[in-house]
């Protein structure tokens, strides 16, 4: 539709990122980061975690030790493909095996002697079963074959029930920036976490808190529960860094506002007063005394030297191999941020900012669980050895303990929605459609439980840090997840890195930093600290920071470090720090590079001519300075121009202020929002509603629908959308379809299509329009003896069963039909009975309102008979079914009209769907009209000038004016029919037609908007929701209809329903519904003296209250409802007396009637 001009080079570069890049191993861009994350875990990280050699127990001053060694870790892929697994109803797991050796080391004069205690060579087929992530095209990390099946989505797990599941990515609780908090006026805390690098196993966590109270500056302490002493932060920094207090004062005061300098002087002076209050103060003695006091307080079994080494050596685990002096300087840099944040809180990243968080991807979930369960496994072995030694006097391990690592249970819980016992839920979803299985693995969410508990969270508001990296439209509009779940934009991904790559990258960066002159990277007093993953490595001369960052970024883009996703952030604003991030879990996306006021895209004239033949990785190699991968922290502290158009309108001096430039607006949407059209032309809420509805749209048939026993609703005759965006095409959503093209008319039809009501043509339905097939899984478990029992009396429920007790293939199940034999029998203890065996049917029945055909039946025989039945049903649109356009113009079928009842145009064409025209004005969905215009224009000219079929590009968010699209439609019509008059051309462009009344065959007075559009059928189907019934089961307590459509439940007749009938004055109806039915009728006797309901004792009605007082009151029989009696009984049980009183009226007397004389009048 558009020409590839220089002004649209940014759009073409953005498209290059979305398409597959086989040279870089990217076959499916939307979920590539999930595939890499999981493959890193199962191919590398699992081996690193399970390979262990460490002491379990030590005796006699470490001269005797019980050791455990786990080795020979092997991961074996399954013998079959994911398709076969789903057909069989099996889980799709890889098998991990290892060897465990437990031995005793004794240190002797001759050396170390080793005595074997126990060993286990894990060859059990169920030792560790790891659910495999199935990638696009049924790929998995252990299968080198890459066969791509167009309609097989990736990013799912298959669990035992053969339900493919996907889950969102949770935000880690640990923040990379310390969390600032105002405890009370003039009292603040600064808490941070320190986590050991990935090469240190098991992972060590430490959580520290710096407290500061303006009224007690001497108590400005750092503390950590049971892992560190409580000590003055200034004195600890002095102890570690070995510098004077004046050095610390100058370091904290450098480049700080006057108010912060005043607080710095006060803190340093308070630390001086603290030292002066102690006679002959020595910093080493002071720290040693605190360590000894903590040793006594904790009652540690370690010696004082071991305790001190353990505490100080493990201080700041993320700087594990760093000298204490650098740890001291790191604490000074933290204190700088803390003091600055007290006065300028708004300039510091808050705890809800995505700058502070890393994100857990699928591989990280399994990695975390493997860590935790391995520690539990080793702990169980240790406890078992101690118990055996205590009870039997031998070092032995039960084989049961060795063969149950516990990982299987943890992994199965993960797919059920439970991540860790102490953490929030991991939201999982069944596999239904293409849209869901792209959007959910790309969703990022906070722990709902954590947000509920903590009062500090404000994440429910759209946080500024989410801009550009998250889709602003695809967010939950209701429910507990509002504001907690966000969708990544199409350009965003999450970083992954192997441990070996991490160490090599860290080494290269450190070598680069140390290549600078030694004095320039040792400005620890007034320089800019350089940190790699929060670990301090140097402090740079302030005069060199700009050159350092610019050179580092250039080298990064050129591949000098071997990783293009390294993040380097220059934090100015008095906090003065250069942060280099290389870890996993960071949000990254590409940006256009601006260098010295020039957009580097414009400096490369060869780029435009070669772009069509290049992949994204080719651009990064051959034109490295055009695009840079930037993480969210670097983006937040950089100057980024909103668009190329705005950048080019600026002056030269203004351009030099920018570091990066963004891509067009369409790349800020997620993949779900990209399936919509022109959301920037509509009102804001339409975008949010449109995303929610698009995920509910029924898509085309997925693989093996007739074989695998799984739930699903599938479109039978799908069509590829004509009006699409590039993201919709590259993600394969367009190719796999989620709707059909229908002809619509915007008009009123006899007042039937009011509000959301739509009219749909009967012949359109009969021809398969928006026809779907429902696949439904029914699963029952039957005790073996019940399944083998024979029925004594013929039951209609068993009419569809074969002689083997299973439902017949191709049988049509109706409501009440059994799917398998389940007969319970009981023996009567009656010696005189001729047949003391009774049996009754307890089978689960088919409960759906519609008939379904049996497609597949599976049986598993164990202690129980597990029967799984797959039923299929073609379901055409009926009254009440829900539909929508891609602009959130939802509609419900209000009337199915025959073709003869519908208006027609001059060619006799009638609309398939009639939509209320006022909905366009009330919902302001202009882009719906544009979509109809572009779809109609495509029908006039479906091929480009080269004779190739080309869809129309109408991105979800675009900066193209409506006039441009009108001009495109005009050119299409002029090309196909150049002889059109201006009026005819205008009518065709704007899809205006004269329709004729079917009753009079006369044209309507005004033209009607009439044209094709892509229409979606939603999952909300009438027959799946209908629960109204006239007769059926009732609950025993309240005798109302039981709940749940699956259990054959109905709608309760409650207060609101009663009030509606009262409003209409339908007294007899209320009496009939609430009282006169057989089940609800209840006779009770009421005491006229106290108002209690009489009790029945030995068949005699007695008022208990009055009988104790030796009274003999009158009992009156009344008829009431059972619910009323239950209510009164429950109120009495809670100590509330409800008295039933009778209305007492005085007797009425009438005057005597006048006498009537019956004599004939002539006698009178």
From Swiss-Prot:
Catalysed reaction, written as an equation: RNA(n) + a ribonucleoside 5'-triphosphate = RNA(n+1) + diphosphate
Pfam families given in the database record: RNA_pol_Rpb2_3, RNA_pol_Rpb2_5, RNA_pol_Rpb2_6, RNA_pol_Rpb2_7, rpo132
Cellular component annotations (GO), alphabetically ordered: DNA-directed RNA polymerase complex; virion component
Domain of life, per lineage: Viruses
Broadest EC class assigned to this enzyme: transferase
Subcellular localization, as worded in the UniProt entry: Virion
GO molecular function: DNA binding; DNA-directed RNA polymerase activity; metal ion binding; ribonucleoside binding
InterPro entries linked: DNA-dir_RNA_pol_su2, DNA-dir_RNAP_su2_dom, DNA-dir_RNAP_su2_hyb_sf, RNA_pol_132_poxvirus, RNA_pol_bsu_CS, RNA_pol_Rpb2_3, RNA_pol_Rpb2_5, RNA_pol_Rpb2_7
SUPFAM superfamilies, alphabetized: beta and beta-prime subunits of DNA dependent RNA-polymerase (SSF64484)
UniProt function note: Part of the DNA-dependent RNA polymerase which catalyzes the transcription of viral DNA into RNA using the four ribonucleoside triphosphates as substrates. Responsible for the transcription of early, intermediate and late genes. DNA-dependent RNA polymerase associates with the early transcription factor (ETF), itself composed of D6 and A7, thereby allowing the early genes transcription. Late transcription, and probably also intermediate transcription, require newly synthesized RNA polymerase.
Protein name (record): DNA-directed RNA polymerase 132 kDa polypeptide
